[in-house]
Amino acid sequence: MYKRQVQGNSAVEQWTNLESLNVLEERFGVQKTQELIKQYESNWITEWDIQNISAMGCNVIRVPFWYRNFMSTPEGAWLSENPDENPGFQRLDWLIEMAEKYGLYVVLDMHGCPGGQSTDHCSGSARKSELFTNIVYQDAMERLWIEIASRYKESPAVAAYDIMNEPQINGEIESVDEDPRNQLYDRMIKAIRKVDPNHILMLEGIWSLSALPDPNEAGWNNVVYEVHPYGITDTDSECEKYKQYNQSHDVPVY
C-alpha cells in the first residue's frame, strides 16, 4: 500500500485553527463562514491533485476530517439536517468520486472528534480532551459515524474507516479492558457494524499495539491495528515487534 494523506482538505487544518474558526463564525455567522471554507477547500485540493497522486504510484489516500466539517457544536447539531446539503458530506462525496475516477482507495479518518480525543492540536480540542468523559460528545460521534457508514457502505472506493486519530487520555490505565479508548472503540464498532458490516475498521494504538485488546477476545472482526511510530531509531526492531503482534493476534498491522 502506497499512501498519501490529503492534509488540509478539510479547510486549513481546521483542527489546528479552532480559535480562528470560532472568530470567523462570531463575526460573519455560520453560513458565511461555511461559504469561505467551501471556497478554500475547492481550491486547496483539486482534481489535478488527485490525478497527480495516482500518477505518483500511490493507491490509497487518507482523508482527515473533523466533526465540525459536519456539525456546528460538539453536542452534535448538524450544519444541515439533509446529508446531501451538508458541506462535510458534499466534500467527501467529491473526494471519493475523484479517487474512484483515478483508481485510488480512500481511508476516512476522523481526525478531530467531538470534545477532542486528546489534548494535542490535531484533535481541534484547544488543549482540552473531554470525549472520554462526556456521554453527549460520544453520542454525537456515534451519530456521525453511523451517518458516514450509512452513506458510503456501498462505495467500492472506500477502503476503511479510521475511527479516531491518535486517541490519548490523562492518567494511568489499570488494564486494557478498562481503557476508555477501547471502550469507546467497542461502542463505535458496534454502531458502525449495524449499518455497514463490510468495510475495514482501523483502530489506533498510536505508539504501542499493546494498548489495544486482542481483537478475537473483544469480538472485533475485519479490523486493522494502526501505529504512528514517530521518530523511531531502531526501525527493524520495531517492525519485528509489529510482525510478532500480527502473528500472535491474527490481526493486520499498519
Q: Predicted segment positions?
A:
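Short, flexible, mixed-charge acidic loops at enzyme active sites
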Residues: V6-E19, G116-S125
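Charged, glycine/proline-rich intrinsically disordered loops and linkers
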Residues: S10-Q34
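An active-site-proximal structural segment forming one wall of the substrate-binding cleft
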Residues: K32-I61, F65, N69-M71, E75-I163, ...
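Short, surface-exposed linear patches
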Residues: V12-L18, D84-E85, K128-E130, V223-Y225, ...
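Alpha-helix capping and helix-coil boundary motifs
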Residues: E13-S20, D84-P87, D177, T235-E238
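Extracellular glycoside hydrolase catalytic/binding regions
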Residues: V136, E142-Y254
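Short, small-residue-biased leader/transition segments that mark boundaries at the very start
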Residues: M1-Y2
